[in-house]
Amino acid sequence: MFCSIYKSTKKQGAYLYIEKKDDFAPVPQELMSMFGTPTMVMVVNLEGRKLASVDVEKVKTAIKENGFFLQLPPPPENLLEKYKKDKAAREEN
């Protein structure tokens, strides 16, 4: 299965995977409004391939069922919580 990957102009780290190049018909208009003007990144064959940030099987299933897959960036790390956990761990030792 080939798909086209586009990056968002409004949300850094967001990518949209669609089956056919420049065919955004399956993507809800509200999502397209939040995504901004899509910028083509690449066309890729998903068969037998690994993707850096997402499970390729989830992408293929979403494209087959919904016509698209939206990849969002991971949530930012809460540095305060990390500090508290590290501090508590040091105090226990």
From Swiss-Prot:
InterPro entries per the UniProt record, alphabetical: YcgL-like_sf (IPR038068), YcgL_dom (IPR027354)
Superkingdom as given in the UniProt entry: Bacteria
Family annotation (PROSITE patterns): YCGL (PS51648)
Domain YcgL: residue ranges: 1-84
Any single Pfam family the record assigns to this protein: YcgL
The protein's name: YcgL domain-containing protein VFMJ11_1829
Highest classification ranks of the organism: Bacteria, Pseudomonadati, Pseudomonadota, Gammaproteobacteria, Vibrionales
